[in-house]
Amino acid sequence: KWKLIAQYINLYYDMDIIENHPGAPVVKANIGFVDLSYRITNKQSIRFELQHLWDNINRSNTEESATVGHEDVYKKRGNWAAALVEYSIAAKWFVSVGDKYNYGNPIADNRDHYYTASLGYIHESTRIVLTGGRQSEGMVCVGGVCRVVPASSGFSLSITTSF
């Protein structure tokens, strides 16, 4: 009835190359996450996800970068924590709520919560998800395809299928 997945990642992320921020320092981070699922019945389950990112950023890095014109790079830096709870019914419907928070940002005004809530339906190989909340700016990678996304608030509808 219980299922646990845990992972650790040691990340070296060159913002100069990946996001075109010439002269920006390299992000060296450690990421850990735990995904814990519990099957309540044959048709119901609940899943908990916890994530943490430890960043190499500190106040002196931020001040040094601001003097050379990279202060925008630090809007999303510092340690992050995230949590998500998802409830599934009949393996077709699910609802989830989550929060991502960069509590370790050295600039207090940039310590933001990014709340989200989702409702989804799965039929065979098609998944439809309506999500509302806040999205932090930065690189988003799904299935090996990465893109830079702006910060946003609102709703999104996602339809994914395979054939």
Kindly give the residue locations of the regions a language model identified.
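Exposed, low-structure sequence patches enriched in small/polar residues
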Residues: 1-163
